[in-house]
A protein has these predicted regions:
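Short, well-formed alpha-helical segments that are part of the catalytic scaffolds
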Residues: 17-32
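Non-catalytic, C-terminal membrane-associated alpha-helical segments of glycosyltransferases
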Residues: 233, 237, 252-321
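A short, conserved alpha-helix in the catalytic core of glycosyltransferases
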Residues: 164-182, 187-216
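Conserved donor NDP-sugar-binding/catalytic core segment of glycosyltransferases
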Residues: 98-138
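A conserved acidic beta->alpha catalytic loop
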Residues: 27, 45-54, 70
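Short aromatic/hydrophobic "clamp" motif used to bind/position activated sugar donors
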Residues: 90
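Glycine-rich, basic loop-to-helix element that forms the pyrophosphate-binding segment
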Residues: 68-85, 95
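Short, flexible, basic/aromatic active-site loop/helix in glycosyltransferases
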Residues: 140-163
Length: 321
């Protein structure tokens, strides 16, 4: 496995995030300064129309800016950013997130464990301390993957814990493992479920995902999405990507029964004229070629690493780290 220089690269995929930059970017510099490590900030601009790039170049000239030729979505933008990064520790960060001063210093010790893929912090409100996200555990409910069930809300004792997934809003990972397990799958472009799938893939290939509540960031929920997308389009892509997630994460009898219940649900949605769900299903079916290529890539990596846990194995992890 290739070795990279020790330091921190912050990757920010951006679409029209200019309005929040004056509030977010200074907090990143402050948190990086606390680490005493070499660092860089890379913004991958996804064809913004709000002068984001101009603002960054004029006000933060040390930030590296990469401009996508066409709007490509979250997973591709992050992959581009990581490919241009210089350091082993990579923070994937939404443009609508503010960091606290000790954000990195409370997480970085976990990355010394060779089996840890990455860490995520506690996510609280932009203007309040209400928790938005934390450690989650996976559930198969009628063969549907549920990853939003949080046990950190009930056990918020400031203890680091295992978590099913690392949120794409603040995913602090190791670059060598990111490449070893295969980067973000761009099949999920433009958005949704790519962080969940990557995290489950890491678990299945023998790595660990950690939640560290002592590290905190503030998030303005779906700020960019609300500005750029219609709810109808968001719903269609959300459902399509949930279907793809199940195809990639499930195996054997679990996948067979999931497909059966999905077909039954499709019949009900047709009867009730739920056209958004139907459109999502059609898009999912059209992507079977890409889905199979993704499965093939996973199987190739699985053979190299000699690891191939099922989703059932993943959901049996112990909560305490």
């Amino acid at each position: 496995m290739r070795e990279y220089n020790i330091g921190i690269s912050v990757i920010i995929p951006n679409y029209n995030g200019l309005e929040l930059f004056p509030q977010t970017i200074p907090t990143i510099f402050e948190a990086l300064a606390e680490t005493k490590l070499e660092n860089e900030i890379i913004i991958v601009d996804d064809c913004s129309t709000d002068d984001s790039v101009k603002y960054i170049s004029e006000n933060f000239p040390s930030i590296i800016t990469i401009k996508n030729i066409k709007n490509s979505g979250f997973s591709k933008s992050v992959n581009i950013g990581v490919s241009h990064s210089s350091y082993q520790f990579v923070l994937i960060l939404n443009s609508d997130v503010k960091l606290t001063k000790t954000f990195f210093t409370n997480q970085i010790s976990h990355l010394s464990n060779p089996k840890v893929f990455g860490v995520m912090s506690k996510i609280i409100g932009w203007d309040n301390d209400k928790q938005q996200d934390g450690a989650t555990y996976p559930i198969l409910e009628l063969f549907k993957i549920k990853t939003s069930t949080s046990y950190s809300y009930k056990h918020d004792d400031n203890q680091a814990r295992f978590t099913t997934y690392l949120s794409g809003a603040n995913m602090f990972i190791k670059k060598d493992i990111f490449y070893e397990i295969g980067e973000f799958d761009e099949i999920f472009s433009p958005y949704y479920s790519e962080d969940t799938e990557l995290s489950i893939r890491a678990w299945r290939l023998g790595y660990l995902c950690i939640y560290e509540p002592k590290a905190i960031c503030r998030h303005k929920i779906s700020y960019t999405m609300k500005k750029s997308q219609k709810k109808k389009n968001v719903d269609i892509i959300y459902n399509r990507n949930k279907f793809i997630l199940h195809e990639l994460a499930l195996t054997g009898i679990s996948k067979l029964f999931w497909r059966l219940q999905l077909f039954i649900e499709l019949i009900f949605r047709i009867i009730t004229l739920n056209f958004r769900f139907i459109k999502s299903y059609i898009l999912y079916i059209k992507m079977f070629g890409e889905i199979n290529r993704s499965i093939h890539r996973f199987n190739t990596n699985s053979k190299k690493l000699k690891q191939n846990k099922s989703f059932t194995d993943v959901k049996n992890f112990k909560f305490n780290y």
